[in-house]
């Protein structure tokens, strides 16, 4: 009976030892990971796209995480999940997973911007920077009522990035807009670009550099004549006629207007 118990103990011991020996140690695991090739990852990501997003979220710097861009740069060429950075040294698309600026940034959605457009008659002073850009040109104001995209893009940018200045103009009997970023160093969050693209069907939206400023230009190519979106343009024009434009703003408008002639 004693011998039998001893054999059982030895048998269990050998079984446990065998299982332990089969488990790869840390060095073996590391060796296994190092054997993964780029084409292996590509195969996995093709089969399981959700893994690619998890992989990009985990790694801190995928390769360099950056790609140079040329200006003028159309937002139609923007890669998903990338931010845009402009500086005197480089203009780049930066992978969102490698971005260090966007964690605390809140960006309005296209729906938020549409609600703000519908309420603009009641919020003239709140949106006065936008209306300064019209220079009390009532014909441009009338055009804006039929092109909610112009206000939406301004609203999204203005609520994401400080120190901007809009200038409205007429092109081919449609309203266009320049947004002047009053700095040569600029970071545009990925989500901001995504929301601009979401509202800009029928528009050409691109970024360029003029002197020491980055310029976002919005050009209407196809006007949607079937829109059911309406605002009280008469009331809006009346409020804007009564609104004073500060001398500092008027001087800035004239300065930028002179620089931007022929820019679009």
UniProtKB/Swiss-Prot annotation:
The keyword Membrane applies. Phosphorylated at serine residues in the N-terminus. This phosphorylation regulates the localization within the inner nuclear membrane. Keywords: Host membrane, Host nucleus, Membrane, Metal-binding, Phosphoprotein, Zinc, Zinc-finger. Pfam families: Herpes_UL31. Residues 1-22 are annotated as: Disordered. GO terms for biological process: viral budding from nuclear membrane. It is found in: Host nucleus inner membrane. InterPro entries: Herpes_UL31. GO terms for cellular component: host cell nuclear inner membrane; membrane. Disulfide bonds: none annotated. GO terms for molecular function: zinc ion binding. A zinc finger (CCCH-type) spans 83-187. Residues 1-12 have a biased composition (Basic residues). Forms a heterohexameric complex with NEC2. Interacts with capsid vertex specific component 2/CVC2; this interaction directs the capsid to the host inner nuclear membrane to initiate budding. Belongs to the herpesviridae NEC1 protein family. Plays an essential role in virion nuclear egress, the first step of virion release from infected cell. Within the host nucleus, NEC1 interacts with the newly formed capsid through the vertexes and directs it to the inner nuclear membrane by associating with NEC2. Induces the budding of the capsid at the inner nuclear membrane as well as its envelopment into the perinuclear space. This is Nuclear egress protein 1. It comes from Human herpesvirus 6A (strain Uganda-1102).
């Amino acid at each position: 009976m004693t011998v039998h118990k001893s054999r059982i103990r030895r048998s269990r011991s050998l079984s446990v030892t065998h299982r332990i020996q089969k488990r790869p140690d840390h060095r073996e695991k590391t060796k296994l990971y190092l054997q993964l090739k780029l084409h292996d990852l590509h195969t996995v990501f093709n089969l399981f796209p959700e893994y690619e997003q998890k992989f990009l979220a985990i790694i801190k710097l995928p390769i360099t995480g950056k790609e140079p861009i040329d200006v003028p740069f159309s937002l139609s060429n923007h890669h998903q999940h990338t931010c845009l950075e402009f500086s005197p040294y480089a203009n780049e698309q930066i992978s969102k997973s490698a971005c260090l600026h966007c964690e605390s940034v809140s960006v309005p959605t296209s729906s938020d911007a549409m609600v703000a457009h519908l309420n603009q008659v009641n919020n003239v002073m709140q949106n006065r920077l936008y209306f300064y850009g019209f220079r009390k040109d009532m014909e441009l104001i009338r055009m804006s009522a039929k092109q909610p995209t112009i206000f939406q893009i301004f609203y999204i940018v203005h609520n994401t990035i400080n120190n901007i200045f809009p200038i409205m103009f007429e092109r081919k009997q449609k309203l266009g807009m320049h947004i002047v970023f009053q700095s040569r160093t600029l970071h545009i969050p990925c989500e901001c670009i995504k929301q601009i693209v979401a509202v800009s069907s029928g528009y050409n939206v691109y970024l360029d550099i003029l002197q020491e400023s980055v310029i976002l230009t919005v050009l209407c190519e196809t006007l949607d004549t079937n829109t059911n979106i309406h605002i009280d343009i008469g009331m809006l024009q009346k409020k804007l006629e009564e609104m004073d434009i500060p001398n500092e703003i008027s001087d800035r408008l004239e300065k930028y207007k002179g620089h931007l002639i022929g820019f679009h």
